[in-house]
Amino acid sequence: MQATDFKNKKVMVFGWARSGKAAAQLLTKLGSKVTVVNGGEFDAQDATYRSLLAADVTLIGTDNAETLDSTYDYLIKNPGINYDHPLVQKAEKLNIPILTEVEIALSTFNGRLIAVTGSNGKTTTTSLIRDMLKADGQNVITAGNIGVPVSEVVFDLTREDTLLLELSSFQLLGLPDIQPDIALVTNIFSNHLDYHKTRANYVAAKFRITRHQNANQYLVLNADGQDTEKFKNETEAQVLEFSRTKQHFPVAFSNGNLTLTDEIVMPTKDIKLVGPHNQENILAAVTVANLAGVSKPAIREVLKTFSGVAHRLQYLFTAGDVKYYNDSKATDIEATQTALDSFDCPTIWIGGGLERGDDLERLLPNLKNVKAVIAVGETQQKIVTLAREAGKPVIAVTDVEHAAPVAVQLASPGDVVLLSPAQASWDQYSSFEERGDNFVASLKETLNS
């Protein structure tokens, strides 16, 4: 789409989160006649609310489907709002195009576009790519699912800049025309089926990242993924692959080194990130960085110092020769399996959270290095049962704040303390970030007392 597609058009923005505000502001700059609808009243003291009112934007404090009619040209939907919402269904019935704020923003951008999607590892890999480009002296702005709406940053970019996007499957559904210069799919598992209904729908949403790429553009894929062949066969882009288990790709871990086109970048022991999943993230990031012209010294500089993204198997600190990690983002069993397998030393594991009917016994094979278990949250009793089945000592406490001092007491020099819940946080916290922050604060208070 072009920016001119929105000029003098009637556009409804559905959702008053940060992305909705950014979309409404950008649309006013593009000359659209904007209406914002929200499932609740607006805060009259909100600065964005006041500025949009001054710009003749209509703001309606209800998401009733009756607010939408055939006079609208576009519906801009918050990615988290499901397509079965009555207002969205009405837009479909009226054949009104349903977009996300990312589509509007990209219509105004003419520089290099790198887009990252996948089930796991998106944020860590995107952050690695960003830091590598910056270390190489390139001007790069990161936005999208990583926390910053694209509409907030796009007006400040020029043709010489790189826009690096992390994109969820929800966002990709509202991006009918995206055409990245470099696209990366980290991996695909069966996630968000409550939203997409089937795995096929979820995979199709991910495929949108490459659907309109051409032969001058690149698609980077995980060679170990079950959907890789489908993507390779259906894309028009040039495909590059990476693999943690195979070494015949341009970027590889080989003989104790990270190599790029058979040249040593650095010894693996000098890389700060831990875990097999982070090896995949590194391989993906280096493949993209190399395509983007990043030098080996810049790649090496980042990998020597990058310790991870907050709440994602994040190394916190070492105290009393015990290493502490915050993996609060591990909201599913697969993520915690990966975290537990990242350490070959005695581990104090803190697990549990929202009850969703998951089969936690799948974690049994991953407990071999676990020294003791601390169970929290709604699934506390399931964690206790799991630990006892594995023959591990287990202590049940109410929450991560109480788990932290227990973990400190249980740990000995050479151990790892790992918060990796394997469950969502909403039984006790508003987000995985709040859960992780509270854990870290309790750890620091305990260690400093």
Curated annotation (Swiss-Prot):
Residues that hold ATP according to the record: G118, S119, N120, G121, K122, T123, T124
InterPro entries: Mur-like_cat_sf (IPR036565), Mur_ligase_C (IPR004101), Mur_ligase_C_dom_sf (IPR036615), Mur_ligase_cen (IPR013221), MurD (IPR005762)
Keyword Cell cycle: yes
Gene Ontology cellular-component annotations: cytoplasm
Main subcellular location: cytoplasm
Subcellular location as annotated: Cytoplasm
Catalytic activity: UDP-N-acetyl-alpha-D-muramoyl-L-alanine + D-glutamate + ATP = UDP-N-acetyl-alpha-D-muramoyl-L-alanyl-D-glutamate + ADP + phosphate + H(+)
Single Gene Ontology BP annotation: cell wall organization
UniProt keyword list: ATP-binding, Cell cycle, Cell division, Cell shape, Cell wall biogenesis/degradation, Cytoplasm, Ligase, Nucleotide-binding, Peptidoglycan synthesis
Pathway: Cell wall biogenesis; peptidoglycan biosynthesis
Entries under Pfam families matching the protein: Mur_ligase_C, Mur_ligase_M
EC numbers: 6.3.2.9
PANTHER family attached to this UniProt entry: UDP-N-ACETYLMURAMOYLALANINE--D-GLUTAMATE LIGASE (PTHR43692:SF1)
Chain's role: Cell wall formation. Catalyzes the addition of glutamate to the nucleotide precursor UDP-N-acetylmuramoyl-L-alanine (UMA).
Protein name stated in the entry: UDP-N-acetylmuramoylalanine--D-glutamate ligase
Originating organism: Leuconostoc mesenteroides subsp. mesenteroides (strain ATCC 8293 / DSM 20343 / BCRC 11652 / CCM 1803 / JCM 6124 / NCDO 523 / NBRC 100496 / NCIMB 8023 / NCTC 12954 / NRRL B-1118 / 37Y)
